[in-house]
């Protein structure tokens, strides 16, 4: 995934499926300068946030870019 798509997903009202290492995640925010995104698991564990490289995020489904 690229940073422009991350920005679109974060600002979108739609529920867009995003995966990190095959696990469904929410994107909480991003660091454009370092090309990193802050994510947490979609299962609700908000306390398990981590920063991951944007390039390692994948979008799946009909809206994939």
Swiss-Prot record:
Swiss-Prot/TrEMBL induction comment: Expressed only in the forespore compartment of sporulating cells.
Entry keyword set: Sporulation
InterPro entries: SASP_SspH
Superkingdom classification of source: Bacteria
Transmembrane residue ranges: none
Compartments it resides in: Spore core
Pfam family, one: SspH
GO terms (BP aspect): asexual sporulation; sporulation resulting in formation of a cellular spore
One cellular component (GO) term of this entry: endospore-forming forespore
Chief location of this protein within or outside the cell: other
Family: Belongs to the SspH family.
Stated name of the protein: Small, acid-soluble spore protein H 3
The organism of origin for this protein: Geobacillus thermodenitrificans (strain NG80-2)
